[in-house]
């Protein structure tokens, strides 16, 4: 009898092998990288006629029009958050999706979002003020559900693998990346698109304006999406994709009161470095969340002793809320692409959300 060779386990190392961004710099990762590396401020004066909001400036995607970008088919009732997500998923697949279509059941999407408060409020208003017998446009109801951008993106781009929506404020992008890592290690997919999206809207602006920002003035709001192709190093090589970064680990904690956010983040950072067997002095690049007020000061304190260049994204693109950490991760990849000396160096991305979540993700670049 001839013994059947045991199947070789797939490589467990998870890598980022592609990325796409829709941001206040415009469509595409090139415009994002150029604006970020030049230090160009992407926020600008708000057109009060189009956007009656209590903000003088914001980081809007320039000239973004869903029908102009995606066409009229299937977009009549699509809201802004969904449109941003669908566009960014399409860009990532177009540039890095070679071979993924061969097995769509093994390619999925993990998208972080805050949902669309504009869609929720508009639909509620229609339900209370609309004319009988219908009162509301039923085609717009899906926009009120948080997983609408994820589901619509998967349908439009034929992603039949795991379809997951996560939400965690400013830490959402890191939470999505971590969730996708768990799915891949559990054998639920061969490749996952992971990231986060956020929309600018009148209702979001009004809510954010009256929120607690740690005793500081609220930052201008931003919008956009950043998505990353996550897979094993082996799968990346088979697909002809270059490894842009290896995910070494993530850690998250909750803090019960705002004064303890810094201590919680410091523990996350210490743990993720220890798990990777590296020290604070080994970090070459840090992309902090830089929230306003006391949270920002606590983040600075938590990162004392961590080496490396700091990348501040929020002052350039505004407060992108759910997309914030995803933009920070995209900024790390943009810097790595422009600086060959960063290959095989470590990058740290951190996030603090005022609702009680902190997180840290460690990457090895190249």
Q: Over which residues does each language-model region extend?
A:
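Solvent-exposed alpha-helices and their adjacent loops that cap or buttress functional pockets
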Residues: 6-9, 100-103, 133-134, 146, ...
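Condensing-enzyme catalytic core mediating Claisen C-C bond formation in acyl metabolism
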Residues: 9, 13-17, 22, 30, ...
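Conserved beta-ketoacyl condensing-enzyme motif
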Residues: 15-16, 37-152, 156-157, 163, ...
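A glycine- and small-aliphatic-rich helix-loop capping segment at beta-alpha/alpha-beta transitions
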Residues: 30-33, 118-133, 185, 207-216, ...
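Active-site pocket-shaping loop/turn-to-helix segments
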Residues: 72-90, 138-145, 163-175, 211-226, ...
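Acyl-CoA/ACP chain-elongation machinery
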Residues: 188-211, 215-217, 250-262, 287-300, ...
């Amino acid at each position: 009898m001839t013994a059947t060779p045991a199947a070789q386990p797939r490589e467990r190392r998870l890598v980022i092998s592609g990325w796409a961004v829709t941001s206040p710099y415009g469509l595409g990762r090139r415009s994002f990288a150029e604006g970020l590396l030049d230090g160009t401020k992407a926020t600008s004066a708000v057109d009060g006629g189009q956007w009656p909001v209590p903000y003088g400036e914001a980081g809007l995607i320039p000239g973004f029009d869903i029908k102009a970008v995606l066409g009229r088919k299937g977009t009549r009732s699509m809201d802004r958050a969904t449109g941003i997500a669908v566009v960014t998923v399409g860009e990532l697949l177009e540039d890095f999706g070679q071979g993924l279509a061969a097995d769509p059941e093994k390619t999925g999407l993990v998208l972080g979002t805050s949902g669309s408060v504009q869609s929720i409020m508009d639909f509620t208003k229609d339900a209370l003020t609309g004319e009988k017998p219908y009162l509301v446009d039923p085609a717009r109801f899906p926009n009120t559900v948080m997983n609408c951008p994820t589901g619509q993106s998967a349908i439009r781009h034929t992603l039949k693998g795991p379809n997951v929506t996560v939400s965690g404020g400013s830490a959402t992008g890191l939470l999505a990346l971590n969730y996708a890592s768990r799915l891949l290690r559990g054998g639920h997919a061969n490749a996952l698109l992971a990231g986060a999206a956020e929309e600018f809207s009148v209702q979001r602006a009004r809510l954010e304006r009256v929120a607690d920002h740690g005793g500081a003035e609220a930052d201008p709001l931003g919008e956009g999406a950043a998505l990353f192709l996550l897979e094993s190093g082996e799968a990346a090589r088979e697909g002809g994709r270059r490894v842009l970064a290896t995910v070494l680990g993530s850690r998250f904690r909750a803090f019960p009161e705002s004064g303890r956010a810094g201590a919680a983040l410091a523990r996350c950072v210490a743990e993720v470095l220890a798990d990777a067997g590296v020290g604070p002095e080994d970090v070459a690049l840090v992309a902090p969340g830089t929230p306003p007020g006391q949270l920002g000061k606590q983040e600075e304190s938590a990162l004392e002793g961590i080496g490396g260049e700091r990348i501040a994204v929020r002052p350039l693109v505004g407060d992108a809320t759910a997309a914030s950490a995803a933009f920070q991760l995209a900024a790390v990849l943009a810097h790595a692409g422009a600086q060959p000396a960063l290959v095989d160096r470590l990058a740290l991305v951190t996030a603090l959300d005022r609702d009680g979540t902190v997180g840290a993700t460690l990457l090895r670049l190249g």
